[in-house]
Swiss-Prot record:
Source organism (scientific name): Serratia proteamaculans (strain 568)
InterPro entries: RraA (IPR010203), RraA/RraA-like (IPR005493), RraA/RraA-like_sf (IPR036704), RraA_gpbac (IPR014339)
The protein's name: Regulator of ribonuclease activity A
Function, as annotated: Globally modulates RNA abundance by binding to RNase E (Rne) and regulating its endonucleolytic activity. Can modulate Rne action in a substrate-dependent manner by altering the composition of the degradosome. Modulates RNA-binding and helicase activities of the degradosome.
Subunit organization: Homotrimer. Binds to both RNA-binding sites in the C-terminal region of Rne and to RhlB.
Family: Belongs to the RraA family.
KW Coiled coil (keyword) present: no
Pfam families: RraA-like (PF03737)
Gene this chain is encoded by: rraA
Domain of life: Bacteria
Length: 161
């Protein structure tokens, strides 16, 4: 489904929170949305492998990487896993790598930057917790909508039709 965050903000301006404009699109799908699952991990993507093995239909993974752009949390292998398990998208408060591969995949990926250095894989982190970045607080179960213009968050699903 295609989302227009500008239009959604016009319609639901009192029901949505707008994430600060820190992110760029890196995935092949420039518009995505769904119910979020949160994870907090700093320069370590081991926990992401476990989460992205789950069925992701209708879901968006929101990763609080502490804003670090020293190591990439998402790479082509993780993006392929997410695509295979039908995740709608991934938002990374941090960095990604292998961007040429990412843009060929049918998944939405927004991150702060790209860097060739990969993350550790020791599974250090927590999932399904409250995370804060971009001027908003994300809870697992909230709904996120993203496109080239920005990212918005709502407690409840928005009527897109």
């Amino acid at each position: 489904m295609k989302y227009d965050t500008s239009e959604l903000c016009d319609i639901y301006h009192e029901e949505v929170n707008v994430v600060e404009p820190l992110f760029s699109n890196f995935g092949g799908r420039t518009s995505f949305g769904g119910q979020i699952t949160t994870v907090k991990c700093f320069e370590d993507n081991g926990l992401l492998f476990e989460l992205l093995e789950e069925n992701g239909r209708g879901r968006v993974l929101v990763i609080d990487g502490g804003g670090s752009v020293r190591r990439a949390l998402i790479n082509a292998e993780l993006a392929r896993l997410a695509t295979q398990n039908e995740w709608e998208g991934i938002v990374v408060y941090g960095a990604v790598r292998q961007v040429d591969d990412l843009e060929e995949m049918d998944i939405g990926i927004q991150a702060m930057a790209a860097i060739p250095v990969g993350a550790a894989s020791e599974s250090i982190g927590e999932s399904d917790i409250r995370v804060n970045f971009g001027g908003v607080t994300f809870f697992s179960g909230d709904h996120l909508y993203a496109d080239n213009t920005g990212i918005i968050l709502s407690e409840d699903p928005l009527d897109i039709e």
